[in-house]
Each structure stands twice: as C-alpha cells, then as structure tokens.
Amino acid sequence: MLDKNGLSYIFLNHINCKSTSKQIIDKVIETLEARSKDIFKQIIMHHIHNSSNTNTGKLGFYGKLKESFDKEIYLNIKNFNNRKAISELRMSAHKLEIEKGRYVNINRNERICKNCDLGEIEDEKHFILKCPAYSVYREGLSRLIYQELGIDLKYSGLVGIKAIFLQNDVNIMNKLAVFIRNCWEKRTSLSS
C-alpha cells in the first residue's frame, strides 16, 4: 500500500532514524491521509474538466467555472434564493434548452433559444451574455461589472462569465444572483 502511493520512503526513513513504532505509524497515517485526499481531489477535478471539454455532459458549464476544490464564495450569500439561483445555473439544474434537449435526446446544435431570433443554442453563455430577452437586466449587471472589475461583458464571452462567477466579492455575487433570478422570471413569463 505504501509503495502504491509512493510513500514507502516514510517507513524506510523512520526505520533508519530509529523512530518508535508509534511514531512511524502516526507519520504513515498522517501522510497517507493527506495523499489520499490529494488523489481524490485530482480525480474529481479531472472528471469535472473532462466533462466540460467534451460539451456532452451535465458538468459542461460547471467544469468551465470550477478551478479548484474549494468552497465557492457565492455559498456565503445569506439570501437562500440568490444562492439557489447561482447554484442552479452553475450546475445546469435548470430548464434552458441545452438541458431540456439533453433529456429528450435532441442534438446539441438543435437546442435553440425560443425566446429570441438569434438562432443560437440556449446555453448558459447565451442566457447570461446574449439573449435579447434579458437585455434590460443585463445592462445593469454589465455596468456594475465594468465599474467594479473593468470587464466588458459584451466582448469578454466565457472569460467574463468565469471572472464574475469566481468573484471573491459577495456583493457582486448577490448582484449576479438578482440578475439570474430576474432573467428566470422573464423567461417563465415568456414561456407561459
């Protein structure tokens, strides 16, 4: 087990140093635990990024945003509905055509937005940056993002989306959540 995890040196070093059995065991357990956690994190991140690169899986958008195996700042938002709005969009737990079509086996390139005439796939990027149906809400968010971060959402594409979603500022994350919630409400009213 130690060899498999590249840790036999710990055992050998402690034997040569005349450490007690308890010291050796404690060091092996401590190091093995840390190594196991590291391997687990690497496997999870690899899976997430592989899914986002293929554009076929549920983790497509999430994988483009997730950079590290840490708690995301938006989880500190006190308002449950705001936190939920960001979570649902990040995890693709929504009803955009990109997800609805996935469940009924519609080809990805045929999952077109029904709320505008751009003829684009209705995915998270289209929803946040492009769909004219939400332009009123987007203008306010765009102004704030430009003032606070110097990012012009109109031209930044996925890089801009990622910069917003990875913010360390809970205030900006709250504004993003309000934007998302307003867009969902508008989308629901357009669908009824």
Residue spans of the language-model regions?
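A helix-boundary/hinge signal
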Residues: 1-47, 52, 124-126, 133
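Family-specific functional microsites
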Residues: 27, 43-192
